[in-house]
């Protein structure tokens, strides 16, 4: 994933 949270 590009981010540690849902982008």
UniProtKB/Swiss-Prot annotation:
Belongs to the O2 superfamily. Contryphan family. The cysteine framework is C-C. Expressed by the venom duct. One of its GO terms (cellular component) is extracellular region. It is found in: Secreted. The modification 4-hydroxyproline is found at residue 6. It comes from Conus zonatus. This is Contryphan Zo747/Zo763. Its target is unknown, but this toxin may modulate voltage-activated calcium channels (Cav) or calcium-dependent potassium channels (KCa). The keyword Secreted applies. The modification Cysteine amide is found at residue 7. Keywords: Amidation, Disulfide bond, Hydroxylation, Ion channel impairing toxin, Secreted, Toxin. GO terms for molecular function: ion channel regulator activity; toxin activity. Disulfide bonds join 3-7.
């Amino acid at each position: 994933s590009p981010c540690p949270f849902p982008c």
